Curated annotation (Swiss-Prot):
This is Large ribosomal subunit protein bL32. Pfam families: Ribosomal_L32p. Signal peptide: none annotated. Residues 1-44 are annotated as: Disordered. Residues 28-44 have a biased composition (Basic and acidic residues). Keywords: Ribonucleoprotein, Ribosomal protein. One of its GO terms (biological process) is translation. The gene is rpmF. Belongs to the bacterial ribosomal protein bL32 family.
Length: 62
C-alpha cells in the first residue's frame, strides 16, 4: 500500500487546491457585430471566425 513519507504541509495542500476553484467564463466583444462571445469560438449570430465565414446563418423567418 502506498503511504506518503512526509506530511503534506498546509501551504503545499493549498497550492494543490488552488486549481480546483471554478472560474467565470471569459467573454470578448466581437469587433464586427459587437456581440459577446467566447474567445477562439465562432460568433453564432454571424457565423464568422477570424474574419472568415465558416457557418451559414439561418434566416430569422425559418
Amino acid at each position: 500500500m502506498a503511504v506518503p513519507k512526509r506530511k503534506t504541509s498546509p501551504s503545499r495542500r493549498g497550492m494543490r487546491r488552488s486549481a480546483d476553484a471554478l472560474k467565470a467564463p471569459t467573454y470578448v466583444e466581437d469587433k464586427d457585430s459587437g456581440e459577446l462571445r467566447r474567445p477562439h469560438h465562432i460568433d453564432l449570430k454571424t457565423g464568422m471566425y477570424r474574419g472568415r465565414q465558416v457557418l451559414k446563418v439561418k434566416s430569422a423567418e425559418a
